[in-house]
Amino acid sequence: MSVNIVVIGMQWGDEGKGKIVDFLATHADYVVRYQGGHNAGHTLVVDNKKIVLHVLPSGILHNNIISIIANGVVLEPQSFINEIKLLEAENLCIRKRIFISESCNLIFPYHVFMDLAREKQKYRNFIGTTGCGIGPAYEDKVARRGLCVGDLLDLSFFSRKLEENVNFYNHQFTNFYHTEKVSFKEIFSNLLKVSDVIISMINDIPDLLNNAINDNKSIIFEGAQGTLLDIDHGIYPYVTSSSSVSGSVCSGAGVGIKNLGDIYGVVKAYSTRVGNGPFPTELFGELDAYFCRFGNEFGATTGRRRRTGWLDIVLLRRVISINSITKICLTKLDILDNLEKILICTSYHLKGVKNKKWDSVPFCRNDWDKIKPVYETFLGWKQNTRGITEFDELPKLAKKYIHRIEELIKVPVYIISTGPDRQDIIIRN
């Protein structure tokens, strides 16, 4: 049987999934993106060179890897082509190693304009989206008016449906949002410039992947965002528009659940999130500034400064349960090197409720504002861990921190990232 791995973010995205996938892809045949769009930003550092991918799977940097964009993804054509050109400028030959599902819904400029128009209208209650048009594109998919990659094979049909959609959105822009209209001719003309490249990559992805499984090939399914942003299991309404849990591999790529192997959960040694929404362990002041500076906590897609906080075991336990996570990949351990003390949230107290201890998430969304984290405190190791590749070489207090995380979540920490480069990794047996 083939060895298939699902790589899932355990927080609010930005956990370092790209680096983990890039590392694991050394022994893989396929890497598959199965949900999300170009709102994801996966940062890789190879030979001290930083590469940020938004659409293409992180395994694309390996010459032997076939990269798949499956049906659960929403694809913005120009961003996709730009990313290909970016990698080709690095002398990577990739076009013949990329396949796209005919069922991928496409993102158009009217989706982006709608995204931004809505955020402007919400004022203080905005979600904090990336403004990439992801939400409106998924809305069109669910409303059954979306245009798919496969529709490009019949340009007469495509043109007619696109004009209908442009008229649909322009009506809203004019009458509800009081913004400028979008041009059908401009959108269609720009799409024609890149359509041949996209058409050349269309393939039957479920058939391709299931044949690969039968041939004992190794497949990595690369998640985007994180479980706490999942449309169903995230902290609603501050969520993304797709399902970012392990179960979405089946619907987003067209493979059966029995063909999934290990579920790797990627988690930072602390917490971050971009955008608005509850964040029980959020830090402010000097500690927040420390993590932003030394962790370079700025969004790969938006450039926005990430909010920072301590590791939250309550949320991690829930994420492990939802995803059936079998192995933990702990990233950015080295960012904790200079701290005097390190905290882990092990439970919550609900403000105003005496002696009430919470070991799970609240039922009422308003209760998120009343949560007070309960912490365990650890002494910092105050030693350099960057670039360490053997677990036994870690400082004693760093190992104690990792062991305590394992005790609390009941899942082994298998991979530890000790720096940005692809070689800064510890594998535990």
Curated annotation (Swiss-Prot):
Keyword Nucleotide-binding belongs to the record: yes
Pathway connected to this protein: Purine metabolism; AMP biosynthesis via de novo pathway; AMP from IMP: step 1/2
This protein's UniProt keywords: Cytoplasm, GTP-binding, Ligase, Magnesium, Metal-binding, Nucleotide-binding, Purine biosynthesis
Cofactor: Mg(2+)
Catalytic activity: IMP + L-aspartate + GTP = N(6)-(1,2-dicarboxyethyl)-AMP + GDP + phosphate + 2 H(+)
Main location: cytoplasm
Positions with a binding annotation for GTP: 13-19, 41-43, 306, 332-334, 417-419
HAMAP family according to UniProt: Adenylosucc_synth
Family, similarity comment: Belongs to the adenylosuccinate synthetase family.
Annotated protein name in UniProt: Adenylosuccinate synthetase
UniProt source species: Buchnera aphidicola subsp. Baizongia pistaciae (strain Bp)
